Each structure stands twice: as C-alpha cells, then as structure tokens.
Amino acid sequence: GAGLCLALACDIRYAASGARLGVPFVKLGMHSGMAGTWLLPDVVGPAHARDLLLTGRIVDADEALRLGLVSRVIEAEAFLDEVLATARDIAATAPIASRLTTAINEPCQSS
C-alpha cells in the first residue's frame, strides 16, 4: 500500500523473497493518490498498473520482478547485507555522474 507508493519514488527497488506488494486502496474504498496513479504506470506500464490499481491485487516478489516493479529479489536472510552493499557501491561512484544518471528520465516524467 503506502509503502509501495513510497518505493515507487525511488531510483532502485528491491524485494525480499516472500515479500508481498500491492496498492489495495480500492478494496478500502480509497484512492491510491498520486504515487499510485502517476508513478505506477511509468514503472510497470499502463496495462499492469490498471490491473493492480483496479483490483487491489497483491503480488509476490517474483511477480513484482516479472512486472518490473522491482529490479531484484533477494533472499530475506541476506536482504539487509545486499542492499547496504549496493548503497556502498553507489556511494563510491562519482557524485555528479550519479546525479546526472538518476536524472535521465526526468524530461519524460514532466511531460
């Protein structure tokens, strides 16, 4: 729900094996807000976004990977170590190059 909406704003999304992700707001009589309706279609495409938003369906980590919702599925026991190692790898790169790389899709998102 809200956790996935927050994750949609991130440059990289990983899931622990066994994780379940979704935007079940419609089942609660609520609108998912801009994160769900604006960011989700950019991440998974409009057809998958409509499916997830209109049904409130929850997907497991493997399906999230297949949909492009996450870029990696990591065993739960190793999750923290793996994401911290990735953070260290990114932090060790050139900051300006990293910043410019994350801005690669900004013109597309503002149209």
Question: Residue ranges of each PLM-predicted region?
Answer:
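Acidic, divalent-metal-coordinating active-site segment for phosphoryl/phosphodiester hydrolysis
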Residues: G56-E63
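C-terminal long alpha-helix characteristic of the crotonase
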Residues: Y14-A19, K27, A61, V70-S111
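CoA-thioester-processing core
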Residues: G1-L54, L67, E82, T86
